[in-house]
Each structure stands twice: as structure tokens, then as C-alpha cells.
Amino acid sequence: MTLSQALNKAKKGLSQKGFRGGLESEILLGFVLQKERVFLHTHAYLELNHEEEACFFELVKKRLNDCPIEYLLGSCDFYGRSFFVNEHVLIPRPETEILVKKALDVISQYHLKEIGEIGVGSACVSVSLALENPKLSIHASDISLKALEVASKNIERFCLKERVFLKKTHLWDRMPTIQMLVSNPPYIASGYPLEKSVLKEPHKALFGGVKGDEILKEIILLAARLKIPFLACEMGYDQLKSLKECLEFCGYDAEFYKDLSGFDRGFVGVLKSFLR
């Protein structure tokens, strides 16, 4: 089977499923052959060997079963860098890059040196923050050992073992004193309908409880109890009112921000007592 024939066959199946058949078939075949997409067109009549053909259509089959393409490739781009991902971590989203930018603004303005992240996942947030600010040390936690293994690989990939430290724990149990807490926690309500491909991601990283904001409220209460001066979190589009009340109750002045689609997506909080 030629490259052209393989692409056309895969494109047809993927398009019928509602995926971007042309693009995704090229990405997957390029991944198998370790070639750029343009190569597939300039060498359209090259023959695939048996192993290449079998590997390609196995990936297509998994994609047709709603496996996210990032898991098939084992990578995802975030904040201009490529991160290792697998089925044990949430796939980094473009809107979370806004959280990184908001956190960096605070870190720069107040010259912060020690911060923390709850729910580190792939470590894309902690790694991005550390690379953008070379003087920063980050302590990051996750409840999932499998997620921490992924995070560790990304920290090693970017040579950050001396500045990003991992620990398996619930929220911030037995963790160091920090100046700022950053988190993109699970915030989807348990009954909320999601696409099949999203449901392939770890449910512990998606669902935040019956209403969805329960873990976020835990984090806010925790930050207030530990008197952490700054708090930056991603949240659900419909959680502004409840979280604003929680932040005010806990003594935080908060500024909320929107995502690229115009939905409420997160906040940066400053402890009022810190500003006095």
C-alpha cells in the first residue's frame, strides 16, 4: 500500500467519525514514519512496509475508538514546548496557558521565589513557570502516582530536577511554606456531558464533585488557613459567583479572567492581610 492509499483510507474512516480526517491521518502517518507531513505528499507513491502499515492502522483504529490523538502521539504542545503525555494525565489545554501567564505576572510583580502547584499532572504548568522564571523554585503535588511519573519525565526532559520538586499527597498535606499556590484542579460537575474522547482522560483529573467547584473551594480554604499570599486557579465557566463568595469569605481579593472563547475561566487572588 502506498502512502497516498493509506492516507485516503484512513481519512475516509476518520472523517466519517467526525474527526479532521485529512489532518489527523497525516499526523499519525508522519508519526509512524518519523517524517514531516510535507514528505507524505512529495513521496505519495512510496510503499509502506508491513510493519509500518500495521502500526499506522492500529493507531487509526484507536483513534476511531475515541482515543485522543495526543495520547497516541505521546506528546502535546503547551506554552511553546512539547510535553510527554499519556492516559494517566489530563491533556494540556490552550486556556491553561492563560493561567500560566497570569501566574507569571504575579511572580514577576512581587519577585516571588517559592511557589506551589496542586494537581501537577503532566507538569506542563510547573515546567512552563520554571522555564519562564529561572529564579523560581516550585513544589508540586498530585494524588496520582502514575501522573507523578509523567511529571517526572517532563521535569527531566527540561533539566529542572533542581527547581521543581514532586510529592504524592492529597492537596497540600505535609508540603513546604510557599508564597503562591497555582492549580488547575478537577472542576467539572459529575453529571456534565462530555465528548467521548474527553472521557478517555483520567476522571480524577476532570470531575470536581457534584457541583464541580468542591475541590476549588477546598484549595481556597486551605490557602487561607496556611496564609498563602497569592492564589491562581483555573475554574469552570459557571463557577464565578460561588467562588467569588468563597474567596471573599476567606479574605482574598480576587480578579477573574476569561478564556479565549469569552467564558469565565479562572482567578488570581491576593490575601487582603498581605496588602495591608
What is each model feature region?
Residues 1-33, 41, 45:
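Non-catalytic accessory regions of SAM-dependent methyltransferases
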Residues 97-191, 218-221:
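Conserved SAM/SAH cofactor-binding pocket of Class I
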Residues 187-215:
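Mobile active-site "lid"/loop adjacent to the S-adenosyl-L-methionine
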